[in-house]
Amino acid sequence: MLKYEYILVRYGEMTTKGKNRSKFVSTLKDNVKFKLKKFPNIKIDATHDRMYIQLNGEDHEAVSERLKDVFGIHKFNLAMKVPSELEDIKEGALAAFLQVKGDVKTFKITVHRSYKHFPMRTMELLPEIGGHILENTEDITVDVHNPDVNVRVEIRSGYSYIMCDERMGAGGLPVGVGGKVMVLLSGGIDSPVAAYLTMKRGVSVEAVHFHSPPFTSERAKQKVIDLAQELTKYCKRVTLHLVPFTEVQKTINKEIPSSYSMTVMRRMMMRITERIAEERNALAITTGESLGQVASQTLDSMHTINEVTNYPVIRPLITMDKLEIIKIAEEIGTYDISIRPYEDCCTVFTPASPATKPKREKANRFEAKYDFTPLIDEAVANKETMVLQTVEVVAEEEKFEELF
């Protein structure tokens, strides 16, 4: 029986781009090549409106599993390539149909004749191909409105593609076309989702995590490393900056009125993150804030916190409720890591009654009583930076190194 030899990738949103589309296509091709590193026989051809992945014997299911997490891919189809002869097309359509998994009762045929000199018209091809499937299967009927399977035939000069297994991609834009941002990665449910949604818009991310030993444990730190590792499924790598925050928090607890300690803490985080962003050539800061979720996420709080940075602050979750955020976290694989019961620095010295409508004037007045600059400098200087990659890529590189 014929087997799938190709995967045809459709771009989706990238097709709206104009003169710079080639940059988007090139970046997507590079990201796909990186994602499929463990499949040495694969060949990739990226055209202006579609990508063709030639499997050359590689497992199409394993390849498909990795493709679904690549941003910039709208949909993709497993495909067979056959000569553009009627009998070959009929046999290819039947073979593709028989390989569809699940409870299939109905189908339809869709034909696109890119090669206009093919001797049969579309309306002549439909009954020929559909009839061949009906003759060689049982308990199957045609449903042109809501079929279980759509057998798609693309006829070209010399060869045709047969497709019926259509799968959804991650959508969005290829990571890397939209610059870089710094993501505040707390270890909770929200911030990894914010990182994911930022990457979906084609933006590379680096993560900043604030930890406060001995008030926060090594297990809490490892949780954040694991979250960053999980996010590498959707990009080439995630650079994680672990910032020691103990002295800053102790000083805030001592010098700032408790009602404003949360606000000032967030302002210090923004200042430190901006410094790291300048070092790393990032263009914005992303947070996992959702409007009204906690005291530090009211409009008044965000207005006061934003004052200390000139960088754009991206808040992808701003209008989502918690259940919507949890749903995405479960889908992308970060939820089970986020709910591990380890504390983070935001729970250290939590005030009993934080201000929900903090004023910039008050925050500035409280901060002016103590020079936080040396503490900020120290936190930036003592940060620990690590680069995380997909586990499989790391394993392949280690395997390569062992040869020498």
Swiss-Prot record:
InterPro entries: Rossmann-like_a/b/a_fold (IPR014729), ThiI_AANH (IPR020536), ThiI_fer (IPR054173), ThiI_N (IPR049961), THUMP_dom (IPR004114), THUMP_ThiI (IPR049962), tRNA_STrfase (IPR003720), tRNA_sulfurtransferase_ThiI (IPR050102). PROSITE patterns: THUMP. Keywords: ATP-binding, Cytoplasm, Nucleotide-binding, RNA-binding, Thiamine biosynthesis, Transferase, tRNA-binding. It catalyses: [ThiI sulfur-carrier protein]-S-sulfanyl-L-cysteine + a uridine in tRNA + 2 reduced [2Fe-2S]-[ferredoxin] + ATP + H(+) = [ThiI sulfur-carrier protein]-L-cysteine + a 4-thiouridine in tRNA + 2 oxidized [2Fe-2S]-[ferredoxin] + AMP + diphosphate; [ThiS sulfur-carrier protein]-C-terminal Gly-Gly-AMP + S-sulfanyl-L-cysteinyl-[cysteine desulfurase] + AH2 = [ThiS sulfur-carrier protein]-C-terminal-Gly-aminoethanethioate + L-cysteinyl-[cysteine desulfurase] + A + AMP + 2 H(+). It is found in: Cytoplasm. ATP binds at residues 184-185, 209-210, 266, 288, 297. GO terms for biological process: thiamine biosynthetic process; thiamine diphosphate biosynthetic process; thiazole biosynthetic process; tRNA 4-thiouridine biosynthesis. GO terms for cellular component: cytosol. CDD domains: PPase_ThiI, THUMP_ThiI. The keyword Nucleotide-binding applies. Belongs to the ThiI family. Catalyzes the ATP-dependent transfer of a sulfur to tRNA to produce 4-thiouridine in position 8 of tRNAs, which functions as a near-UV photosensor. Also catalyzes the transfer of sulfur to the sulfur carrier protein ThiS, forming ThiS-thiocarboxylate. This is a step in the synthesis of thiazole, in the thiamine biosynthesis pathway. The sulfur is donated as persulfide by IscS. This is Probable tRNA sulfurtransferase. It comes from Bacillus cereus (strain B4264).
